[in-house]
Design a protein with these regions (language model features):
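Nucleotide and nucleotide-moiety/phosphate-recognizing core
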Residues: 1-175, 180-183, 190-193
């Protein structure tokens, strides 16, 4: 199944002291570059990649993919980035992932997409936790998401609860780098390039 990947790099990164998370380096490369490498290594790579970002747009654009700022004011969260992606690719099946999704099984996209028929959304979970921001979505959900955001909804979990949704278990632990300390800890284990 062909798909468009949407990388979320538009957050405020408040738990990282406000630095632009996608540009934080891990072993000499920004997280966005590592995530793009993880996508390129997929057994089923995307046809197109979009990057949701609200700062340093030129730095993200240098990676050669369309950069989409939020269309809603006041940084309303990752769902605003998702809405911008849906509006930019209205007929595409989307694979949404945060800019710290740099360690993915090579069949990650293929497995999520294979589970999508009969569902509106399929998200991922690993042995430690559910990852609602790692998900595949059917096209045609932009109006439902816009209505949820207009009603004041901001939570990915809350929006997923309104949809036909399934969570797919992944045996490999997926990174969740919400602090600079977590990035540094992963860097200690990172193999040399």
């Amino acid at each position: 199944m062909p798909y468009t990947a949407l990388i979320l790099a538009g957050g405020q990164a408040s738990r990282m002291g406000g630095v632009d998370k996608g540009l934080v380096e891990l072993a000499g490369q920004p997280l966005i570059a590592r995530t793009l490498q993880a996508l390129a290594a997929q057994s089923q790579p995307p046809q197109r990649i979009l990057i949701s970002a609200n700062r340093h747009l030129d730095e993200y654009a240098a990676y050669g993919h369309a950069v989409l700022p939020d269309t809603l004011p006041d940084y309303p969260g990752p769902l605003a980035g998702l809405l911008a992606g849906m509006q930019a690719a209205p007929d595409a099946t989307l694979l949404m992932l945060p800019c710290d999704a740099l360690v993915l099984p090579v069949d990650f996209a293929a497995r999520l997409l294979a589970a999508l028929p009969g569902q509106q959304v399929v998200s991922a979970s690993d042995p430690a936790q559910w990852h609602p921001s790692l998900l595949a979505l059917q096209p045609g959900l932009a109006a439902a998401l816009a209505a949820y955001l207009a009603s004041g909804g901001r939570s990915i979990r809350g929006w997923l609860a309104t949809l036909q949704h399934q969570s797919l278990h992944v045996a490999q632990k997926l990174p969740n780098l919400n602090t600079l300390a977590a990035v540094h800890q992963l860097e200690q284990q990172w193999p040399a390039d």
